Amino acid sequence: MSWYAYCIAERNAFPELCRHRRPMPLEGVTGLFGNQTFLFPASDLAVIVSEHTPEDAARMDQSAAKDHANVIADCFKLSTVLPFRFGTTFADDDSLRRSVRSNQRHFTANVERLRGKAEMHLKVLVDDTCPGTSERDLTVGQLYLTSLRESAARQRERQSRARALSLQMHRMFLPIAEEITCKRTDSGKMLLDIAHLIDNKTVERYQNKYTSALQEMKECRMQLSGPWPPYHFVQRQAPQHNA
């Protein structure tokens, strides 16, 4: 039987696994396509899985991706979790056990590092004030070179502003760790996508700081979501599996 994998969790978070060595149903959590989820014990860990068929493989769409995330979020309420990428499958019981066994030290270290932690997600949208290319009385070649120089200058200015904003956010929220990406939107604005790793106990304090940030940084449009499982902070090591 093939298994679809959602995440790795701590075995001791699920009392029903204390007396069993075989997969046990995880009550109250529905998997992809309405399938029953199971707790698959593997040493000190548990892998949350559901049965997977060839027909299921043809139905892996955006709705399925959302269901995948919902299962991980439900498990996160019960345990530290290490999310698997959407679409991760294992051919059979032995394949799943081998993967966990070969990555045991890596998985355990991640669980220890992320225990009691959560991810908060900030989107910060600001005007991109870098000037556009001005067309003067220049030849085609001169315009091209001028465009290249101005593009490079805009990119440097954009990166400098992104770093300044990122530092401001870091000082304001004081996360344990952070992952930041910056891009220019189609509307010409600059979007900072910020993931902050924080202690579970400080979620309310973080939310209060966000409320203050909205008042202090009126030139920015901000959006907060979370707490989430720490997707951005799981140190990846390719597990051996059949996908």
Model-derived regions, located:
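An interfacial alpha-helical scaffold signature
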Residues: 1-243
